[in-house]
């Protein structure tokens, strides 16, 4: 009685078939002609990570272009051009009623909060009109009735002290100071104008990230190409 004769024969036959399949590439002959083998060097794990890093940097730069273009560049380009003039402080006032605002900065400052509304009235030397002064164009878009809007709500006493410090500064500054107004109307007089620095920062950093990612991917491809050429040269020398 031979219970294991059939499996042994199957195993031997399978082994002969595998030997026959592996013997063909090893012989290097197909229809009498030698096989042309094109070696393909596998990329290392470090090269794969570097390539992924470069692609991620390029993708993030495109996202930065989109976000900065819609949130900063678009309002800046659509805003009317401003001309420089001189302003003289007439009087300052802190409204009795605090205003509600949704603070969106990071950390514990997120959420709803209130802040004191500081109003600074100045005399515009260009037209002689009494107008409301704002810190910058963002303050006009956020709340055109106040000089500025705090970035974070923080402590109530801290917000009030900050508003009082700014009020005291304008009360003691009786001279004239430069300001910027819109020729379209007396509204929207700002203390600080957003200039070409905004455009520079919105374009420079995403472009730098894009070029850095492309440089990393290009260096990885160049390294792989040089390695492949080196292996071909070594194969020719050994032959």
Curated annotation (Swiss-Prot):
Question: Which of the residues are on side Cytoplasmic?
Answer: 1-51, 219-239
Q: Membrane-crossing residues?
A: 52-72, 198-218
Identify the keywords attached in UniProt to this record, alphabetized.
Answer: Disulfide bond, Glycoprotein, Ion channel, Ion transport, Membrane, Transmembrane, Transmembrane helix, Transport
Q: What post-translational changes are documented for it? A: N-glycosylated. The extracellular domain contains disulfide bond essential for the gating mechanism.
Membrane topology of the entry = Multi-pass membrane protein
Glycosylated sites: 86, 123, 174
A Gene Ontology cellular component where this protein is annotated is: plasma membrane
InterPro entries with a match to the protein in the record: K_chnl_Ca-activ_BK_bsu
User: Where does it mainly reside?
Assistant: membrane
Ranges facing Extracellular side: 73-197
Its Gene Ontology molecular function terms?
calcium-activated potassium channel activity; potassium channel regulator activity
What is its subcellular localisation? Membrane
One record GO biological process: detection of calcium ion
Chain residue ranges for the region called Disordered: 15-38
Q: Which domain of life is it from?
A: Eukaryota
Q: How does it assemble?
A: Interacts with KCNMA1 tetramer. There are probably 4 molecules of KCMNB3 per KCNMA1 tetramer.
Domain comment, in the record's words? Answer: The extracellular domain forms gates to block ion permeation, providing a mechanism by which current can be rapidly diminished upon cellular repolarization.
Q: What does this protein do?
A: Regulatory subunit of the calcium activated potassium KCNMA1 (maxiK) channel. Modulates the calcium sensitivity and gating kinetics of KCNMA1, thereby contributing to KCNMA1 channel diversity. Alters the functional properties of the current expressed by the KCNMA1 channel. May partially inactivate the current of KCNBMA. Two or more subunits of KCNMB3 are required to block the KCNMA1 tetramer.
Task: Give the family this protein belongs to, as stated in its UniProt record.
Answer: Belongs to the KCNMB (TC 8.A.14.1) family. KCNMB3 subfamily.
Q: What is this protein called?
A: Calcium-activated potassium channel subunit beta-3
Originating species: Rattus norvegicus (Rat)
Q: Which gene encodes it?
A: Kcnmb3
């Amino acid at each position: 009685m031979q219970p294991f004769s059939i499996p042994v024969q199957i195993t031997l036959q399978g082994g002969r078939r595998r030997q026959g399949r592996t013997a063909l590439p090893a012989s290097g002959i197909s229809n009498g002609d030698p096989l042309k083998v094109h070696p393909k060097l596998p990329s290392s794990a470090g090269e794969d990570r570097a390539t992924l890093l470069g692609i991620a940097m390029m993708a993030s730069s495109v996202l930065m272009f989109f976000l900065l273009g819609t949130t900063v560049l678009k309002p800046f380009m659509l805003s009317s051009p401003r001309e420089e003039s001189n302003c003289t402080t007439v009087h300052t006032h802190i409204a009795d009623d605090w205003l509600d605002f949704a603070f969106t900065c990071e950390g514990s400052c997120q959420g709803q909060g209130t802040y004191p509304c500081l109003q600074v009235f100045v005399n515009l030397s260009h037209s002689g009109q009494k107008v409301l002064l704002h810190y910058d164009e963002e303050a006009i878009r956020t709340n055109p009735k106040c000089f500025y809007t705090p970035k974070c709500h923080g402590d109530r006493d801290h917000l009030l002290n900050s508003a009082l410090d700014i009020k005291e500064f304008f009360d003691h500054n009786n001279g004239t100071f430069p300001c910027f107004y819109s020729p379209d109307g007396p509204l929207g007089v700002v203390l600080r104008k957003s200039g070409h620095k905004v455009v520079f920062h919105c374009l420079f950093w995403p472009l730098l990230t894009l070029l850095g990612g492309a440089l990393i991917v290009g260096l990885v491809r160049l390294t792989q190409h040089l390695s492949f050429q080196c292996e071909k040269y070594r194969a020719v020398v050994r032959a």
